[in-house]
Amino acid sequence: SISYILEMNADNINLDGKIYTQRIDLTSKNEINTLKDAIVSVSDNAALKALSLNNKAFFYVGNKLTSNVNSIVNNANLQTNSIEFNDLKNLVNTGLLLSQEDLSIITDKFENKANAYLLSGKNLTLATSGNGNSFNNAGNIIANSALTVDVKNADATNSGILQAIAKDLKLTAKNVNNTGAIESGLGI
């Protein structure tokens, strides 16, 4: 379906078809699920409010994606111009999470699985907060500019790639367990 503004409000939202719209506002009491064959293409802004977002689709936002979601599991392709994920309880990425501009994530628990990509065209800030927080990266976390990983109350486990291409990489953690690559200022 094609529309200018698409608003949905339901106990659960399951998207399995194709959605093309200028703006989208999805509000669910429980879950927002995008299924494997779905396409969600938003040319401007998207706002998501739910207990959890489970993305298995191609989900594109042309401008800014904001969320009031407790948990995000990205198993596919989530792309936008700018992302702010604040006050998450859990973020698990097994796919591609891409921001053309800045990417900011604040979550209690973060896991970027092997072969997963968390990419930012500019600055990428990833922080953990709360009790029982954790940071595990087995994939690729790459910022075209600066990369800040602030997990000062938790251990940072990296078996993948942490990379700031053009600027500084700042990693603050209780303990750092690195068997992967940590690279900054390569100017590639």
Give names to the regions the model predicted.
Residues S1, N14-Y20, T34-S41, N54-Y60, ...:
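Short, T/G/N/S-enriched strand-turn elements that build extracellular solenoid repeat scaffolds
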